[in-house]
């Protein structure tokens, strides 16, 4: 082989070696990247999850703060209960908010709720009556059909009779003798109110109506006299307060006049006593003069 051919073959081998080495490096690089890709992906996913969690935590923090603020506001709010509309049985009352009202108001109504008092309401009055019939009403609130009603006819020394009427209103015709009725208001089979009524006869009702005007006239007369006396006393007090200086001078002059009269009466009394004593003293002096003359 010639030296030129040997040099060419050596250069060719060197070139092929470099190409093989470059191919191996590229292959290793591809494998390395192929091996590292899953880890990188997993790391990227983990980082994404961490970022999502951080974002969710950042978003949840304002929500938690808002919930805390709401809870604090609910704690600050104060509730006050109004008076019940009834003194017995079942009624309604207002629930008032005394703090945190809209518009800066001192109190505002939140809701209306049911309230209850003592069960026994005693004796009630009819809602309407005439010479022939009477209408009686049970204790209830709206809606009326929420409760159950039991009407009883009360009899002395006997068991009460349960009537067929189960409504809140009972209309009764007057009889020749007075009658007594009782209504029981039930809520979930629990008695929440009872009230009794007396239904008088026609003659008794007429007698009550005839005697009522006399009583009313006496009551009106007494009230009128009382009002007049109160007005007179008020005017006298106002006059004394307005003219206090004049009133004070008047009482002072009256007091001085009384003192002068008392002094004059005391002086007259002294003069009268001195006059009464002088005749008794004169005979004593005469006796002394006679005794001296005799000596």
Curated annotation (Swiss-Prot):
Glycans are attached at residue 72. It comes from the Eukaryota. Residues 1-29 form the signal peptide. Detected in spermatozoa (at protein level). This is Sperm acrosome membrane-associated protein 1. The modification Phosphoserine is found at residues 256, 278, 291. GO terms for biological process: acrosome assembly. Residues 242-295 are cytoplasmic. Plays a role in acrosome expansion and establishment of normal sperm morphology during spermatogenesis. Important for male fertility. It comes from Sus scrofa. The chain crosses the membrane at residues 221-241. Keywords: Cytoplasmic vesicle, Glycoprotein, Membrane, Phosphoprotein, Signal, Transmembrane, Transmembrane helix. It is a single-pass type I membrane protein. Interacts with CYLC1; the interaction may be relevant for proper acrosome attachment to the nuclear envelope. GO terms for cellular component: acrosomal membrane; inner acrosomal membrane.
């Amino acid at each position: 082989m010639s030296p030129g051919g040997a040099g060419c073959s050596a250069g060719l081998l060197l070139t092929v070696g470099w190409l093989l080495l470059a191919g191996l490096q590229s292959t290793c690089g591809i494998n390395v990247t192929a091996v590292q890709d899953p880890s990188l992906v997993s790391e990227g996913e983990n980082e994404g999850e961490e970022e999502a969690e951080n974002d969710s935590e950042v978003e949840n923090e304002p929500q938690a703060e808002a919930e805390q603020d709401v809870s604090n506001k609910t704690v600050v709010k104060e509730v006050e209960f109004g008076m019940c509309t009834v003194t017995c049985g079942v009624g309604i009352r207002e629930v008032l908010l005394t703090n945190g009202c809209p518009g800066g108001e001192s109190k505002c109504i939140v809701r209306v709720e049911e309230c209850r008092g003592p069960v026994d309401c005693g004796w009630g009055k009819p809602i309407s009556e005439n010479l022939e019939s009477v209408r009686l009403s049970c204790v209830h609130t709206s809606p009326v059909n929420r409760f159950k009603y039991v009407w009883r006819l009360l009899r002395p020394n006997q068991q009460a009779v349960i009537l067929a009427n189960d409504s809140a209103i009972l209309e009764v015709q007057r009889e020749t003798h007075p009658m007594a009725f009782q209504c029981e208001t039930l809520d979930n089979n629990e008695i929440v109110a009872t009230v009794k009524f007396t239904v008088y006869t026609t003659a008794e009702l007429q007698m009550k109506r005839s005697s009522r005007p006399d009583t009313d006239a006496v009551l009106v007369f007494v009230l009128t006299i009382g009002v007049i006396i109160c007005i007179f006393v008020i005017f006298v007090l106002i006059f004394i307060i307005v003219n206090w200086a004049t009133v004070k001078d008047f009482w002072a002059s009256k007091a001085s006049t009384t003192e002068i009269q008392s002094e004059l009466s005391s002086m007259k009394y002294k003069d009268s006593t001195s006059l009464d004593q002088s005749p008794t003293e004169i005979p004593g002096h005469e006796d002394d003069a006679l005794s001296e003359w005799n000596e």
